[in-house]
Curated annotation (Swiss-Prot):
Record's protein name: Acetylglutamate kinase
Location relative to the cell: Cytoplasm
Organism encoding this protein: Xylella fastidiosa (strain 9a5c)
SUPFAM superfamilies in UniProt: Acyl-CoA N-acyltransferases (Nat) (SSF55729), Carbamate kinase-like (SSF53633)
Domain N-acetyltransferase residues, every copy: 274-420
Pathway per the UniProt entry: Amino-acid biosynthesis; L-arginine biosynthesis; N(2)-acetyl-L-ornithine from L-glutamate: step 2/4
Length: 421
């Protein structure tokens, strides 16, 4: 699935968190119905490696089926399912049944899991006249969840609420997940879907979204509308209320481990991210922090007087100095002198966000990379072409004339290294 180093890096990061701050996993009813084997396999794997996710589920498709069988027509208003007193018995039965089915499937997989179908969400009527027995959450009680976590058992929570007087209310599962996340402040929020992520205009999964640099442009795209636009807006609102390190992952149940434990992931990773600083002179940057970023990323030392002797064309640096691109000029084409990303920012999409901003302003570009550089797979995908030398791979973008490419290759061969072991 990934290198042992990658998996160990993420496992160490997750294991250092308080148990209830690891992850909230939102599971839709369609996943429970269609993909429960992959779901339970992935959740069981997390427990095997010492991590306990908090699972919250809906049961929309199952409820639709039961209501149809009972001759009751589904009615929604403003996205909320109208829940009349005569349908509440069916709602309760469906949620309890779905919850127990997931518990039993987890137990068959050797996992420990706890059924929680009440006692978490205190609620009041959203608007009884309009929606019937639909609740708006007024408080979240963590005691049942914490008891489950202390027993190293996966809490499996149904999105049902109760009024202070004990009336059961139907709670929208997305709303319940948002409120639970707001109280828990988890490191990861995971939405499991059949699509495996947010899709772009070509129907391909968007790997990562850095909201600080991409949200305004993304939300204006013609292919972002309806449910997808609403989902992105909801995720932004969710992350705005969470610590900077929190993130949302949207993936398939079968790909959950890959999304969590590899830099590349498998799905869409959404983070608030960091603003990107653009500089054209070294004096506009915090050079000690930039030096630390470069040396930590490459695990090598910059040559003495690097900043004094290197003519800067442009630098793109994340505001917390966790990722940077440095451009200089060798000849007439911008030269990518450094692309550095700290270990703890790997897999966040932060490096890609900085890279994308640089590329928007830099149609022509060339750079070199050592043969054993782990970023080479990324460079192959991002470049228009490459050439192998004894010690370097030379990559380029936007160069179409052989003579120009030849000059860039020659520059790379002659340019002395600026990092030493």
């Amino acid at each position: 699935m990934a290198s042992t180093k990658e998996i160990s890096q993420y496992l160490k990061r997750f294991s250092q968190l308080d148990a209830k701050r690891f992850a909230v996993v939102k599971v839709g009813g369609a996943v429970l119905r269609d993909d429960v084997d992959a779901l339970t396999s992935s959740l069981s794997f997390l427990q095997e490696v010492g991590l306990t996710p908090i699972v919250l589920h809906g049961a929309g498709p199952q409820l639709d089926e039961e209501l149809t069988a009972a001759g009751i027509q589904k009615k929604t208003v403003n996205g909320f399912r109208v829940t009349l007193p005569e349908t509440m018995a069916i709602v309760r039965k469906v949620f309890h049944t779905s919850n127990l089915q997931l518990i039993e499937a987890l137990q068959r997989n050797g996992a420990r899991a706890t059924s929680i179908t009440g006692g978490v969400f205190e609620a009041h009527y959203l608007d009884q006249e309009t929606y019937g027995l639909v609740g708006e959450i007024s408080a979240v009680n963590l005691a049942p969840i914490e008891a489950s976590l202390r027993a190293a058992s996966i809490p499996v929570i149904a999105s049902l609420g109760e009024t202070p007087s004990g009336q059961i209310l139907n709670i929208n599962a997305d709303v319940a997940a948002n409120e639970l996340v707001h109280v828990l402040q988890p490191y990861k929020i995971i939405f499991l879907t059949g699509t495996g992520g947010l899709l772009d205009a070509d129907g391909k999964i968007i790997n990562s979204i850095n909201l600080s640099t991409e949200y305004e442009q993304l939300i204006q795209q013609p292919w972002v509308y309806g449910g997808m636009k609403l989902k992105i807006e909801q995720i932004k609102h969710l992350l705005d209320r969470l610590p900077l390190e929190s993130s949302v992952s949207i993936t398939r149940p079968a790909d959950l481990a890959k999304e969590l434990f590899t830099h590349k992931g498998s799905g869409t990773l959404v983070r608030r991210g960091e603003r990107v600083i653009r500089a054209t002179t070294w004096k506009d940057l915090d050079l000690p922090r930039l030096q630390h970023l470069i040396q930590s990323s490459f695990r090598r030392t910059l040559i003495p007087h690097y900043f004094e002797t290197t003519p800067l064309l442009r630098a793109y640096v994340s505001e917390n100095y966790r990722a940077a691109v440095i451009l200089t000029k060798l000849g007439n084409v911008p030269y990518l002198d450094k692309f550095a990303v700290l270990d703890d920012a790997q897999g966040e999409g932060l490096g890609r966000a900085v890279w994308s901003i640089m590329r928007e302003e830099t149609p022509q570009l060339f750079w070199r990379s050592r043969h054993n550089n782990q970023a080479n797979a990324f460079y192959y995908a991002e470049s228009d072409g490459y050439y192998k030398q004894d010690h370097w791979k030379i990559f380029w973008n936007g160069l179409h004339h052989f003579q120009q490419i030849q000059q860039c290759v020659a520059h790379c061969a002659q340019h002395p290294p600026t990092l030493i072991d």
